[in-house]
Amino acid sequence: MLKLFSAFRKDKIWDFDGGIHPPEMKTQSNGTPLRQVPLAPRFVIPLKQHIGAEGELCVSVGDRVLRGQALTRGRGRMLPVHAPTSGTVIAIAPHSTAHPSALAELSVIIDADGEDRWIEREGWSDYRAHSREALIERIHQYGVAGLGGAGFPTGVKLQGGGDKITTLIINAAECEPYITADDRLMQDCAAQIVEGIRILAHILQPREVLIGIEDNKPQAISMLRAVLADAHDISLRVIPTKYPSGGAKQLTRILTGKQVPHGGRSSDIGVLMQNVGTAYAVKRAVIDGEPITERVVTLTGEAVSRPGNVWARLGTPVRHLLNDAGFCPSADQMVIMGGPLMGFTLPWLDVPVVKITNCLLAPSVTEMGAPQEEKSCIRCSACADACPADLLPQQLYWFSKGQQHDKATAHHIADCIECGACAWVCPSNIPLVQYFRQEKAEINAIRLEEKRAAEAKARFEARQARLEREKAARLARHKSAAVQPAAKDQDAIAAALARVKEKQAQATQPVVIQAGSQPDNSAVIAAREARKAQARAKQAAHPMADSAIPGDDPSKAAVEAAIARAKARKQEQQAGSEPAEPVDPRKAAVEAAIARAKARKQEQQAGSEPVEAVDPRKAAVEAAIARAKARKQEQQTGSEPAEAVDPRKAAVEAAIARAKARKQEQQTGSEPAEPIDPRKAAVEAAIARAKARKQEQQAGSEPAEPADPRKAAVAAAIARVQAKKAAQQQVVNED
């Protein structure tokens, strides 16, 4: 009795909520053995036939390839694809693939040569001699992916399982109507499938291995039982026929009673699941050394005359397979890739067969029925009762239609397995699965964009951190590379700084002056006397050199005299703006007479002595001083009324003065005179005038009268005569 209860517990199965029982329609194709299809003349191999990124190309246009030769390199989740036959690569270009929207993907197009030659194959018959990692790498490089419909890379799935897998489940349920590919494969290749299961068990080392198969496959069940008759490491579980019992979460629930959490995976509860077709592909990759180049495809539907299951090479056009099955299309004929519930209609028949293609359904018009019009949801909740994932399809429908992505995510739309049970039972004929697929695609696109933004932000922050680190390192290098002065240099610098500080301290000390004391200037006085003595000695040593220096150019002297006259004229104009008082001619005549008397007396006194040359500079200075004194006297006497000026007398006196000056020049012209520098004379005259002007400004506090123009004219005439005399003397000396 105890053994009976143990056996009962061992073979116990559970049930899942929801599910439907549609017509199976499997007998059309599962009654005939697997057969080979003639090679197509051209193959189109998409680079991406799995979940993940496409691999890196390793062939070029014009290359000749063999069957099983890798067309791409697989790294990470990039699964390689292989040539399905021998031939020549004629193009590498985008081509429409097996997708509901017939998207174009990069593909390698090969023209078959008809020889179908293999690459050199190396099998591992004793696979237990190889490590777990080597087996996983071989499975990955030979292009094995999930053949049940998901297309997830098998090597990546095995690597992710690690040591936490306790139960390995082989999915042989094949619950969708019309599809019999796994059923026929188990009938014809049961031993190879079991061998592949043992390879997977060797890699994962689980505690138990379970095969789940529906009870509507009696021939396959009998074949597996025959192979497993003496095996105790693998258990075969027959489950009731119910759609979708072949789903990963649903089959896990049926065989183990465990529930996969929302948003989780079966590996989270220690379960890993593989398809029977995948197990067969693993056996061929490891033991036979053959990459996956073909798979079993069901050709069924009332539009084909020879339904059945065939070995279809990957990349074979759908049209070629249907024509081999006797395809008789009708008007508005549809062809579905996959089953009637989870498949999609092909837009045209030139798309190729890929790794996830398990069925090509060509129904007649009466078989599928006419398409019905979509109506409004009546909130009947039939979809919720049929959902095997315990979701609320009617709510997800409204969220998807209203673009409410957050609410759809909160209601676990990601857990939808797109089985189509909700759409099957919907009385309003609403294509719920299409809405859910579109909503999930939009959510994935939003998440991908957010991920890219986060990665860009992380790259920016990493770059900023790197720049900061480089800046800090650069500053540290600069500081460490700075030249440090040696000890000797430091001593010299310290001594120099001490001297500077001492001088600064001395400069800042206050000077103390004692009353009654005199400064000691003896050194300065001695230096001045020495310079004077040196100058006198130098002058005595060269007495003749100085006298022999000829005068400057008379033309320059004339120019400078003209400049002096212009300045005097400008000064007269500036002074002419103020009204001038009348000049007293009597005073002017008296002063002119006094000047003549003084000059005559000086000539008489100097008559006995040789006449020296007249120094025009002294004369100009004396004339300026005389004019200043006269001006001052006029200002002092300006309060008295002046008599009327007789212009005739003034003119006579000026003429007499000019005649006397000319006579004096003639008397002194016979003796040689020292050369006179007219420029110096003009400069000294200008200095004298400036001094006189300054004296006038200082005396400007009292009201001043305008200067006597006659005196100025007389002085200017005398200056001109003296300049002319100097020029004549210069000419005589040159001769």
UniProtKB/Swiss-Prot annotation:
Segments carrying the region annotation (Disordered) are 538-715
Keyword check for Transport, yes or no.
Answer: yes
Q: Would you say which domain of life the source belongs to?
A: Bacteria
The record ties this protein, via PROSITE patterns, to: 4FE4S_FER_1, 4FE4S_FER_2
4Fe-4S ferredoxin-type domain ranges (all copies): 368-397, 407-436
Subcellular localization, per the record?
A: Cell inner membrane
Example of a GO biological process term: electron transport chain
- Enzyme Commission number(s) from the entry: 7.-.-.-
Query: Where is the major localization of this protein?
Result: membrane
Record's compositionally biased regions (Low complexity):
556-565
- Keyword set includes Zinc-finger: no
Q: For this UniProt record, give its keywords in alphabetical order, as a comma-separated list.
A: 4Fe-4S, Cell inner membrane, Cell membrane, Electron transport, Iron, Iron-sulfur, Membrane, Metal-binding, Repeat, Translocase, Transport
Please tell me where [4Fe-4S] cluster 1 binds in this chain: 377, 380, 383, 426
Q: Which GO terms describe its cellular component?
A: plasma membrane
User: Required cofactors, per record?
Assistant: [4Fe-4S] cluster
Q: Enumerate the residues binding [4Fe-4S] cluster 2.
A: 387, 416, 419, 422
On cofactor binding, the record's note says: Binds 2 [4Fe-4S] clusters per subunit.
One Pfam family here: SLBB
The protein's topology relative to the membrane is: Peripheral membrane protein
Recall the GO molecular function terms of this protein's record: 4 iron, 4 sulfur cluster binding; electron transfer activity; metal ion binding
What function is annotated for this protein? Part of a membrane-bound complex that couples electron transfer with translocation of ions across the membrane. Required to maintain the reduced state of SoxR.
Under NCBIfam families, the record lists: PRK05035.1, rnfC
The Swiss-Prot or TrEMBL record describes its family as follows: Belongs to the 4Fe4S bacterial-type ferredoxin family. RnfC subfamily.
- Quaternary structure note: The complex is composed of six subunits: RsxA, RsxB, RsxC, RsxD, RsxE and RsxG.
The protein in question is named: Ion-translocating oxidoreductase complex subunit C
What is the organism of origin for this protein? Salmonella typhimurium (strain LT2 / SGSC1412 / ATCC 700720)
Q: What is the lineage of its organism?
A: Bacteria, Pseudomonadati, Pseudomonadota, Gammaproteobacteria, Enterobacterales
Please name the gene that encodes this protein.
Answer: rsxC
